[in-house]
């Protein structure tokens, strides 16, 4: 054995190399890293400084999407994935394709201006009958397969990628939290989120045959908190959100929204 090898052995270089290789294999098996960063999560920039690899950034965003309750089926989907020709089930939209194209334009417009909207700088938009109004909150109405959940999920992800705080709320789960006496702590957390988040999205809004007596009070409470925040809210329903019996807060939240009807094939 050469003197250099003896010296490396004394310093434990071989052991260090082995540990590094084992660590790399572990990261590979866990699906962490990529060939670009040699499974370390970091690369070296042109000026010689360490930079986070794109694979690590995506992992970071996935964790944020999970915390924001974004349905996993829509992770990494974007506005560009909106299909103007068919609905979610592949049914041809026919004459409604023109409406779908307008929806795509609206989503692109909203996404481009999302940062300003969350900062209280509302862009103006010309819509039906050439009416011009400032755009902040939107209420999307549509049937099953019209793309409501897709839109909800991609806009939340877009906000997160822009370093904005956003969260996706499923109506069924939200109602359960607000009407369960044992979930008061969670209900209080929801209230604080409605006060502070840059963007709140509620998907799947519908009327149930029976509503808990406390629903009106709690829904009114969080609705008023959201209105007073001055920040945008996106609502997604099958078209009967106005019929939900509750207080003035919920009705005011609905009235603050620009109502958009999505193309739908029965």
Label the model's feature ranges.
Residues 129-152:
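Walker A/P-loop nucleotide-binding motif
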Residues 149-164:
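P-loop NTPase Walker A phosphate-binding motif
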Residues 89-104, 135, 141-143, 160-196:
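Short glycine-rich substrate-engagement loop in P-loop NTPases that contacts/grips substrate
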Residues 108-135:
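Phosphate-binding P-loop
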Residues 172, 190-215:
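Conserved P-loop NTPase "ATPase switch" module shared by AAA+ and STAND
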Residues 164-165, 196-199, 229-235:
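Loop/turn-to-beta-strand initiation segments
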Residues 1-105, 259-260, 264:
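A short, basic N-terminal segment
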């Amino acid at each position: 054995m050469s003197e250099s090898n003896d010296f490396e052995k004394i310093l434990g270089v071989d052991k260090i190399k082995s540990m590094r290789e084992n660590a790399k294999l572990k990261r590979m098996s866990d699906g962490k890293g990529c060939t670009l960063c040699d499974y370390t999560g970091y690369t070296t920039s042109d000026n010689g400084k360490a930079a986070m690899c794109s694979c690590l950034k995506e992992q970071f965003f996935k964790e944020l999407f999970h915390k924001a309750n974004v349905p996993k089926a829509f992770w990494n989907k974007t506005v560009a994935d909106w299909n103007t020709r068919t609905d979610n089930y592949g049914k041809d939209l026919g004459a409604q394709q023109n409406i779908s194209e307008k929806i795509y334009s609206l989503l692109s417009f909203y996404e481009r201006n999302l940062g300003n909207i969350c900062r209280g700088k509302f862009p103006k938009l010309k819509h039906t009958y050439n009416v011009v109004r400032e755009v902040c909150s939107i209420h999307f109405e549509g049937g099953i397969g019209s793309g409501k959940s897709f839109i909800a999920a991609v806009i939340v992800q877009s906000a997160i990628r822009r370093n904005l705080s956003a969260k996706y709320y499923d109506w069924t789960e939200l109602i359960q939290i607000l009407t369960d006496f044992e979930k008061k702590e969670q209900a209080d957390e929801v209230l604080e989120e409605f006060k502070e988040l840059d963007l709140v999205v509620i998907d799947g809004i519908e009327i149930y045959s029976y509503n808990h007596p406390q629903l009106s009070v709690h829904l009114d409470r969080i609705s008023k908190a959201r209105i007073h925040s001055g920040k945008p809210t996106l609502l997604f329903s099958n078209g009967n959100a106005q019929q939900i019996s509750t207080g003035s807060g919920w009705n005011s939240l609905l009235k603050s929204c620009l109502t958009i009807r999505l193309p739908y094939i029965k």
